Amino acid sequence: MEMKPKYDPREVEAGRYEEWVKNGYFKPSEDKSKETYTIVIPPPNVTGKLHLGHAWDTTLQDIITRMKRMQGYDTLYLPGMDHAGIATQAKVEAKLNEQGITRYDLGREKFLEQAWDWKEEYASFIRAQWAKLGLGLDYSRERFTLDEGLSKAVKKVFVDLYNKGIIYRGERIINWDPKARTALSDIEVIHEDVQGAFYHFKYPYADGEGFIEIATTRPETMLGDTAIVVNPNDERYKDVIGKTVILPIVGRELPILADEYVDIDFGSGAMKVTPAHDPNDFEIGQRHQLENIIVMDENGKMNDKAGKYEGMDRFDCRKQLVKDLKEQDLVIKIEDHFHSVGHSERSGAVVEPYLSTQWFVRMEDLAKRSLDNQKTDDRIDFYPQRFEHTFNQWMENIRDWTISRQLWWGHQIPAWYHKETGEIYVGEEAPTDIENWQQDEDVLDTWFSSALWPFSTLGWPDLESEDFKRYYPTNALVTGYDIIFFWVARMIFQGLEFTDRRPFNDVLLHGLVRAEDGRKMSKSLGNGVDPMDVIDEYGADSLRYFLATGSSPGHDLRYSTEKVESVWNFINKIWNGARFSLMNIGEDFKVEDIDLSGNLSLADKWILTRLNETIATVTDLSDKYEFGEVGRALYNFIWDDFCDWYIEMSKIPMNSNDEEQKQVTRSVLSYTLDNIMRMLHPFMPFVTEKIWQSLPHEGDTIVKASWPEVRESLIFEESKQTMQQLVEIIKSVRQSRVEVNTPLSKEIPILIQAKDKEIETTLSQNKDYLIKFCNPSTLNISTDVEIPEKAMTSVVIAGKVVLPLEGLIDMDKEISRLEKELAKLQSELDRVDKKLSNENFVSKAPEKVINEEKRKKQDYQEKYDGVKARIEQLKA
């Protein structure tokens, strides 16, 4: 198969994925004696196209499953997508708004048709992106969180938890999103520090004798106040407990009550109680049987309980209310106050604590079981392990989960209310006399169905499902650390509750993809990167390798075009190395021609030893998910050892007349390159398939080739040490040539003073390598080499490498040249020092610019020290 002179990812990747899918290479094995390995894809939302975070996520999953397939496992990498209730509904509503239509204009049924159309459109985009990334998914098993099978699972779980008393319906303070008009769970609320105000008001005593000072950050809620509370141990208020105050504006009389919840040292020590608009106030209200007065509607506008402010937006009401209180001389002071305010993770709206009747999951027992399970043999291993502590902490402090959402797109709650009696019926099927019942209009939190993903996608609740019996529990979950609470924790407690087993063995957590400057990627900053654009420019293999090897587990990844380009250069290096190897191997060379039992050269033994070391390292690190370290091991072996050294060394026998030695070299080239392709394949599936198909091979595809194994018979420690000595000598000679400004093309005398006779013999036996790579006019290897007075000497493991300088360079001229270079470097150092000592520059310049100047200083200093040392050496 022809390989073009330059690596072209478009040509390499064209049609390859379709061929893999068509031939069923990603389907599980038919050999049921094999051990299974399963990963279910974290389902991307059908809200839009995939971003770099998705690309990172799925690349890691694909690397793991491809590797496990090659290691002989029966692998299943199961695809699917999430309906993403609130996010998708918002997108569809925005699209309708462009046409001047609301969801209420359409009605529920027609709106859901629009949502399904949206889903189909974006699902096709997502599949196309999966294909471009090269993901080895079994599309015959693709699932969607609203498909029939998953809907059945959701209903069963809801009904079972309801019957156990774990799911309940109750009136509680919930997080209300007035923009999306739905309840939110605690972890869907993002807390942001904002500049606000602390308002101090007078609440006059009903008897006309003075006032009590009350402070609040949300004046609009005072319209729903039903009491004032003070700490019973607060001496300031002991005499007023039992008295009443008049609620400003409204005129309602409020009792002053004693409650130990109040912090004596905070504010005035007196606190207003608004049970319908604050979770702590609600608890106080329950203790004192206070009335719950809701003063806002679901849109965040003031309702009829707000009196003259009815119909006003809550924030407009705040301004007007403060203005009115000032006019009545009831404002004591207004202080600037920097505080944390909850915002909707989806809509960005300021979240309103709001009294509402919702459905909840009682979390105490579910959380305890998850925590207890981590102390058993069925525990889940977290990578990095520190995230287990994060998981445990959250589970230990968990609150009940609000699961109802005031949306249309999602799993409608399987609860019905009798039209006459109000009786509640919860069941997997609708009541038989459906005409007498009204189904709850709310849907379930998206994460409720996502929490069942590892087992619902495999056929549960059908316990006899072949997929469920064979592929559950799954082996690894790969996802971002930002959804440990949203998703990972919930899958764990639901998996334990409904299957009595952990849903996955390992959890591999990665960070966020950030812009090059470390900032979060976002539309508003305009610094987002479309992974498909990167693939169009550099190829899927370049992007995959960068994503997989660019950081360590649990850490964020800074996207860098320069680094992706450097991966492209690495692949191009591999490509060129493969082209050279294939040209020398020849088209007639077959797998059966590979013979490594012949007369292996030192270079052959060395590269085979390094190959086996790399196989062992890559396998071990991959099992620990240390793909960053894997990347370094592969890069060092392929770029340095194979391409830069072995390929060059192989030219010695290939350019000789020794046919037997040529055949041995062909075998080593073929064997080594084949193993390199198989090690690289999970990371770079496209280019490795292309090169592997050109190599002598067995089988139809590298996808199903076996993972490389260490062969003890091909490890030659002594040869490795000898080659290390030779390489060190060659590097020393080349560095010395640079330092005395003598090109490699010019022959020079080289002396090697061997440390002992054994080394002298070894180096003499392998002097062909030194001659090829050092280009000596004469080469003298001996233990008793006489070192000339004027010479450049380097100490190496094998002894000393000496370059006689007499006649090689004009000493005075070279010293003069170096002194001029030293002066230039001193000038640059002075310039950078002046800049970095300038307080004005340091205080105003961006951190990136300052760091760049520091880097320059370090570079100049290293060069300065090197040039100065060379001058001193020449003068000596």
From Swiss-Prot:
Keyword Nucleotide-binding: yes
Coiled coil: 805-876
Binding site for ATP: K523
Cited InterPro entries: aa-tRNA-synth_I_CS, aa-tRNA-synth_Ia, Anticodon_Ia_Val, M/V/L/I-tRNA-synth_anticd-bd, Rossmann-like_a/b/a_fold, tRNA-bd_arm, tRNAsynth_Ia_anticodon-bd, Val-tRNA_synth_C_sf
Keyword Cytoplasm recorded: yes
CDD domains: Anticodon_Ia_Val, ValRS_core
Record key words, sorted: Aminoacyl-tRNA synthetase, ATP-binding, Coiled coil, Cytoplasm, Ligase, Nucleotide-binding, Protein biosynthesis
Predominant place of localization: cytoplasm
Entries under Pfam families matching the protein: Anticodon_1, tRNA-synt_1, Val_tRNA-synt_C
HAMAP family documented for this protein: Val_tRNA_synth_type1 (MF_02004)
Function as written in the Swiss-Prot or TrEMBL entry: Catalyzes the attachment of valine to tRNA(Val). As ValRS can inadvertently accommodate and process structurally similar amino acids such as threonine, to avoid such errors, it has a 'posttransfer' editing activity that hydrolyzes mischarged Thr-tRNA(Val) in a tRNA-dependent manner.
PANTHER family, per database record: VALINE--TRNA LIGASE, CHLOROPLASTIC_MITOCHONDRIAL 2, VALYL-TRNA SYNTHETASES
Assembly notes: Monomer.
Family recorded in the similarity comment: Belongs to the class-I aminoacyl-tRNA synthetase family. ValS type 1 subfamily.
Protein name: Valine--tRNA ligase
Species assigned in the record: Staphylococcus aureus (strain Mu3 / ATCC 700698)
Gene label: valS
